[in-house]
């Protein structure tokens, strides 16, 4: 294949990997039930006796799936409880922008040793290594992202260039100064950098000849957009998918890349599951496993996480199994369509942050003078992601400084500072939420430049 | 040497490495040595060897 990361697992028969993973899942369930407070509580509440489980089929039938709401219900009010467990070396929180609370993931030394392995597969498959510089742009705080990126680079022998605190112009400059071979960004941020580079008359294919790989994560993207990015940057697009729950990357594109083919025949590439590290189920709404070409919810079980494993965790992400019978790379790992993982709930990725409209509802509608609002996420003329709020007030003369107060409140809630415009009473006459079916906020519209050709 | 026998030999060497690292950690925890930083580093090495053995895969 070339550009492999670990031939043993990449070429192991799929049935052998599956057997290995299924056996380990049973061990993990038993150990979690004995040692992890959440699972002791959760399995007791579901009357699960892990000693009865003999096969994966038993587990699939009897082990309940876990949701964010379950974890938050257990963690409620005891954020620090996990830290008092013996052997804890780090704690990683989810972003906290859901309005539901933050999941708490204590990590021990085994977790830290495993933190960079999945990411290293992604980088090595993307052709990075041997001291190549990689510009990192994804923001982080008490989430897993910071330690994860550093560990992944270290494991892949890639030198991180930490561009988190740089503005877009500074990041373009860093690509040049450090002669970066790789760039890690969300599709939206890549779009922003592209608009800025075009505005500056930069021609990356010739001005940044060292750049050969762009690793996308966090959002879906269109085929035509991706093709345009490859042409402009003179670099191959790759993708990695992972989360705090998965202890890093669980799916990554192989050396073939995120797009395959040329010209008008370009199609989406393949994400491969690191099946020896994360057990992946794709469940249709009826609970059955999705077949080739079908979409379903991504449900994961971590096979390497130690202090806080995730067992049949429902990610809330919708993914499509690869419709093709094989990938040109020849690897035996499970296959999924690149570029089209999307949320099942209302979550929107904005500037790399997870934003749930419900959290913005709480921040904006907290003011008694506000009666309703509408939000638009869009890409401005400079390629920057913006959130514009039109806020309707009860009085024709709203309180002074209301725009500023709302900006601050939204920033505190979800980490994004919106543009705010106050509009007079009676502006909005349409219903803010759908009257039937699954809840979907109608206050929000998303019109981004990078996601134009999503498959249904 | 074909890749299977090379891998078998590597797994054997890593097993010896794991045994040695565990032995070192036990020795370092002797309180007369009084070097928690050494004990902690050995704990980290042992965790990394566990991860290494997982990536190597079963024999």
Positions of predicted regions on the chain:
Chain A
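Nucleotide 5′-phosphate-binding alpha/beta core
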Residues: 1-93, 99-114, 125, 286, ...
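Active-site phosphate/ATP/adenylate-binding loop shared across adenylate-forming ligases
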Residues: 2, 6-7, 66-233, 238, ...
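Short, well-ordered beta-strand segments
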Residues: 133-136, 299, 390
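Generic structural signal for residues in well-ordered beta-strands
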Residues: 160, 237, 280, 373-375, ...
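AMP-binding/adenylate-forming catalytic core of the ANL superfamily
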Residues: 183, 304-414, 439
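Short, solvent-exposed loop/turn segments at the edges of secondary structure
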Residues: 209, 273-277, 343
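Conserved AMP-binding/adenylate-forming
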Residues: 221-326
């Amino acid at each position: 294949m070339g550009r492999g990361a670990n031939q043993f697992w990449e070429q192991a028969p799929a049935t052998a990997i599956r057997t290995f993973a299924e056996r380990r899942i049973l061990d993990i369930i038993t150990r979690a039930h004995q040692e992890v407070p959440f699972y002791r509580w959760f399995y007791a509440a579901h009357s699960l006796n892990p000693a009865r489980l003999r096969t994966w089929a038993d587990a699939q039938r009897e082990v309940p799936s876990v949701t964010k709401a379950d974890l938050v219900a257990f963690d409620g009010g005891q954020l620090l409880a996990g830290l008092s467990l013996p052997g804890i070396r780090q704690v990683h929180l989810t972003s906290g922008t859901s309005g539901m609370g933050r999941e708490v993931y204590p990590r021990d030394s085994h977790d830290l040793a495993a933190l960079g392995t999945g990411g290293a597969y992604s980088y090595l498959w993307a052709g990075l290594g041997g001291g190549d510089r990689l510009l990192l742009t994804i923001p982080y705080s008490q989430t897993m992202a910071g330690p994860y990126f550093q560990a992944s680079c270290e494991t892949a022998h890639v030198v991180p260039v930490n561009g988190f605190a740089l503005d877009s112009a500074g990041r373009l400059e860093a690509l040049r100064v450090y002669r970066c071979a790789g760039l890690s960004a969300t599709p939206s941020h890549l779009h922003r950098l592209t608009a800025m580079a075009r505005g500056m008359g930069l021609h990356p294919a010739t001005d940044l000849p060292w750049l050969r790989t762009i690793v996308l994560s966090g959002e879906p993207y269109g085929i035509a957009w991706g093709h345009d990015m490859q042409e402009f940057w003179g670099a191959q697009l790759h993708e990695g998918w992972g989360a705090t729950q998965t202890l890093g990357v669980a799916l990554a594109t192989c050396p073939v890349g995120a797009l395959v083919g040329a010209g008008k025949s370009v199609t989406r590439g393949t994400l491969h599951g690191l099946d020896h590290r994360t057990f992946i189920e794709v469940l249709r709404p009826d609970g059955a496993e999705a077949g080739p070409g079908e979409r379903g919810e991504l449900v994961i079980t971590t096979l390497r996480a130690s202090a806080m494993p995730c067992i049949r965790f429902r990610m809330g992400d919708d993914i499509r199994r690869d419709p093709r019978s094989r990938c040109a790379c020849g690897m035996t790992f499970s296959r999924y369509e690149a570029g089209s993982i999307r949320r099942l709930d209302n979550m929107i990725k904005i500037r790399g942050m997870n934003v749930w409209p419900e959290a913005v509802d709480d921040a904006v509608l907290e003011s008694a003078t506000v009666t309703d609002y509408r939000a638009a996420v869009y890409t401005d003329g400079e390629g920057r992601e913006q959130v514009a709020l039109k806020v309707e007030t009860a009085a024709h003369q709203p309180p002074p400084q209301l725009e500023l107060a709302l900006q601050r409140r939204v920033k505190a809630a979800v980490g994004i500072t919106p543009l705010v415009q106050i509009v007079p009473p009676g502006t909005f006459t349409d219903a803010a939420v759908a009257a039937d079916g699954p809840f979907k906020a109608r206050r929000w519209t998303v019109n981004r430049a990078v996601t134009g050709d999503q498959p249904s | 040497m074909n890749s299977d026998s090379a891998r078998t030999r590597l797994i054997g060497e890593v097993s010896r490495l794991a045994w040695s690292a565990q032995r070192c950690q036990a020795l370092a925890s002797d309180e007369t040595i009084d070097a928690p930083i050494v004990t902690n580093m050995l704990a980290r090495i042992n965790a990394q060897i566990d991860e290494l053995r997982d990536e190597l895969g079963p024999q």
